């Protein structure tokens, strides 16, 4: 037999090189096994994240989104009469909530299941995106179908992609308990990273053609309608890098090749999406849909030093490595302290990958690397000078840093770490094994936490037992109580106005629920944990002296024999 590439000679013929066989296709059985393993891993991850999510009580924020999805599921697709917050999540989490509610009904479990689903998707998408770019093949020109001499979005396609995927998934594998409310609970920008990674899978894997930027622009626009944070995490970084690299290429080579036009097309599509998406709230209101609360100016340069420190801690918190948290050396269990220390390795790798990515901004090659690096820097900078940088809970505004950093680390460092593992097996393999075991143990530790009831569950149970099925309360006792009761008790949010009279709270509320012609409400949760100051006095000024008053579990519940909605000032 002739060896691969060996010349052969037939009688009467000149020597020709033997044909080189193409790469063998993976058998269907092997692909099925691989798909089964991925499905099993996804199921295990979903279960662990679902369990950890239940360790944090559901509040009115997530409950409001549950009720909005419930309204959409029952025909109010545009959320007519609804006032949403400054982020609607209309095209991101709400469709997901509708799907879960169609299968499981209305209740607190919707948020926990959705959070687990979202984070599982993020881990899997980060692994796939970190694994590698567009498959090999002859690239095409952006405007024509002509072959291009250069690969627009990346040079080469390294075969060993598993280390990259494992590293990216590993860095996200086990969110620490302190970050559960950010990463594994209500919609708070974490879920917006799912469509972001999907968009980048399209950019990274699709062959360059004119319709790819068009699809990218449409996806960015749809995502921005739901959450404008995509401006910082995807749109602005792509515009800056695309335009910057095009300008640098023009200066360096004096002409625009297919790669330059393609990246400019991506940047233009992203810029157009940013403009179009900004009109989303106004378009929805004009169509008779929800009205969105305006996004307040949140820049505060007077606390820059404090903001920088909180930003640094927030970055560590997202990666599960915040050793500067006040409870680190104190009230935390010793095991949790160990997990946080182990997660420092992941945070260090993310910072290392960020530095490598920034150094490649103007280097021809993968577009995803400099864009993700710029996105991380933009998010850190915007958060640092914002009013959100007051405490660690505000780190939800930069939750996308975790998947972005994980993808960068896997993409840029996965092969290098695999090489080190082979070269220094004696000492490097034990280090990797300890870190892997630590991350897996942290995943199990989070899943082992005891579930806690939803925030409004005790109050909802008492109200239902006493026949009080519709009433008013402060924001934090309103929608959370409604969802905790699976809709059997409906509590609408009110707030004192300048006259100390109660008026509807135009934040995550359905104005139809205040209509006295359609509903009868006869109680107010007037005092208790997180209740607006002065609620009891405002309730009596608005509705008169109550017929009965109850004091239950720290709450004061005032009851009237009349419909209090009739006296509620809805003009305010």
Report each predicted region and the residues it spans:
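Membrane-interface transmembrane helices that cradle and orient dolichyl/undecaprenyl
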Residues: 17, 138, 146-148, 153-155, ...
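Signature aromatic-anchored transmembrane alpha helix within multi-pass, membrane-resident enzymes
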Residues: 30-41, 413-449
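Transmembrane-helix motifs of polytopic, lipid-linked glycan transferases
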Residues: 38, 113-157, 198, 348-352
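Membrane-proximal lumenal/periplasmic loop motifs of glycosylation machinery
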Residues: 52-60, 74-95, 108-109
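Membrane-interface micro-motifs in multi-pass membrane enzymes
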Residues: 58, 86, 90, 157-204, ...
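Short hydrophobic/aromatic helix or loop-helix immediately within or flanking a transmembrane segment
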Residues: 64-70, 83-106, 313-329
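Hydrophobic/aromatic-rich transmembrane helices and adjacent perimembrane loops
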Residues: 188-195, 232, 334-349, 365-420
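Membrane-interface alpha helices of multi-pass inner-membrane proteins
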Residues: 212-239
């Amino acid at each position: 037999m002739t060896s691969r590439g060996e010349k052969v000679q037939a009688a009467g013929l000149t020597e020709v090189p033997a044909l080189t066989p193409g790469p063998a296709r993976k058998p269907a059985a092997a692909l099925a096994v691989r798909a089964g393993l991925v499905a099993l891993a996804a199921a295990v991850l979903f279960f662990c994240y679902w369990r950890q999510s239940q360790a944090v009580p559901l509040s009115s924020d997530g409950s409001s989104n549950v009720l909005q999805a419930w309204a959409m599921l029952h025909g109010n697709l545009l959320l007519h009469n609804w006032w949403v917050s400054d982020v609607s999540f209309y095209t991101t989490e709400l469709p997901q909530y509708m799907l879960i509610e169609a299968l499981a009904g209305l209740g607190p479990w919707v948020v926990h299941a959705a959070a687990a689903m979202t984070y599982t998707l993020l881990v899997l998408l980060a692994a796939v995106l970190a694994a590698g770019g567009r498959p090999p093949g002859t690239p095409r020109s952006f405007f024509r179908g002509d072959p291009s001499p250069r690969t627009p979005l990346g040079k080469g396609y390294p075969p060993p992609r598993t280390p990259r995927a494992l590293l990216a998934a590993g860095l996200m594998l086990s969110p620490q308990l302190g970050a559960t409310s950010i990463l594994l609970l209500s919609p708070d920008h974490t879920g917006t990273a799912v469509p972001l990674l999907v968009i980048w899978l399209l950019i990274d894997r699709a062959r360059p053609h004119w319709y790819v930027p068009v699809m990218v622009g449409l996806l960015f626009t749809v995502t921005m309608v739901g959450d404008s944070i995509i401006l910082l995490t995807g749109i602005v970084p792509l515009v800056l890098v695309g335009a910057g690299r095009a300008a640098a290429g023009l200066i360096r080579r004096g002409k625009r090749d297919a790669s330059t036009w393609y990246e400019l097309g991506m940047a233009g599509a992203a810029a157009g999406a940013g403009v179009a998406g900004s009109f989303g709230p106004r378009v929805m209101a004009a169509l008779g849909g929800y009205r969105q609360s305006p996004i307040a100016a949140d820049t505060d340069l007077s606390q820059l030093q404090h903001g920088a420190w909180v930003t640094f801690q927030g970055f560590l918190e997202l990666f599960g490595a915040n050793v500067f948290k006040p409870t680190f050396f104190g009230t935390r269990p010793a095991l949790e302290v160990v997990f946080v220390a182990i997660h420092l390795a992941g945070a260090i790798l993310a910072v290392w990958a960020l530095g490598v990515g920034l150094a490649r901004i103007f280097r021809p090659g993968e577009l995803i690397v400099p864009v993700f690096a710029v996105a991380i820097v933009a998010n850190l900078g915007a958060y640092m000078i914002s009013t959100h940088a007051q405490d660690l809970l505000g780190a939800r505004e930069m939750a996308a840093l975790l998947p972005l950093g994980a993808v960068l680390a896997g993409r840029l460092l996965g092969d290098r770490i695999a090489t080190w593992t082979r070269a220094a097996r004696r000492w490097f393999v034990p280090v990797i094994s300890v870190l892997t075991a630590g991350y897996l143990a942290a995943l199990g530790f989070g899943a082992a936490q005891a579930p806690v009831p939803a925030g409004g569950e005790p109050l909802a149970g008492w109200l239902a037992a006493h026949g009080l099925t519709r009433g008013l309360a402060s924001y934090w006792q309103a929608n959370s109580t409604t969802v905790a009761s699976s809709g059997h008790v409906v509590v609408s949010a009110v707030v004192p106005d300048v006259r100390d009279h109660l008026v509807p709270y135009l934040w995550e509320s359905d104005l139809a629920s205040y209509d006295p012609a359609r509903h009868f409400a006869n109680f107010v949760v007037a005092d208790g944990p997180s209740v607006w100051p002065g609620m009891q006095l405002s309730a009596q000024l608005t509705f008169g002296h109550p017929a009965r008053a109850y004091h239950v579990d720290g709450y004061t519940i005032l009851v009237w024999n009349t419909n209090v909605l009739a006296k509620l000032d809805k003009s305010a």
